Amino acid sequence: KSTKAEDVPVYFVDCGANAFSAEGKAYRKDYTDTLKNTVPDQAYSETSGWGFTNPASEVEANGSGDAYTTIRNFKAGNNQKTMTYKFALDAGTYEVVTGFYDPWAQWAGDDRHTKITVADEAGTELAVHEDHKISGSKDSVTLENITLSEAGNVTVNLSPLKKVDSNIDSCDVLVSFIVIVKKAAEQPDIPKTDTKAGLKAAIDLAKT
């Protein structure tokens, strides 16, 4: 392995999946020293340090296949709620990548929009993406420069932006995956084009 500092993924959460794919298993093998999650998705527990914090009665898993087509979503009737995942992180600077795909896009139309925020334990926003339309296209949003001066918990929060009473379930948020990448602390000798190697690997896997 290279002796140069590199970006490394610390969480690869395949939301809604009940097992890692073959690619996911290979990926876990490559980053066995840095990845903190040993299962694709779960409810939060203090012991493991990560997971969704919404009551299990509100959310469900859907889909099969790749990282995009497996999703965590709200059960019908649990409207206008924020979906939150919590993660324990060491001090450092991070990027958070959220992946999206709506299998019900033909019914949602333009109603499924989300605001994405990353916040610290005090609730202070560390990064925000104001408006992302979740559609039938597989895509992702990257939030950068998330810095923790000391170890602690962060939350990734997905909040609905639209309220259309006639199509209320289709206004609710859903998520395909969450990848958290720790940025290399010092990169004096690394060409700029290589600084996102770990992140690129994470996204490439998600698209397979």
Kindly give the residue locations of the regions a language model identified.
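Compositionally biased, intrinsically disordered or flexible polar/acidic segments
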Residues: 3-186
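Beta-rich interaction/scaffold domains
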Residues: 1-6, 183-208
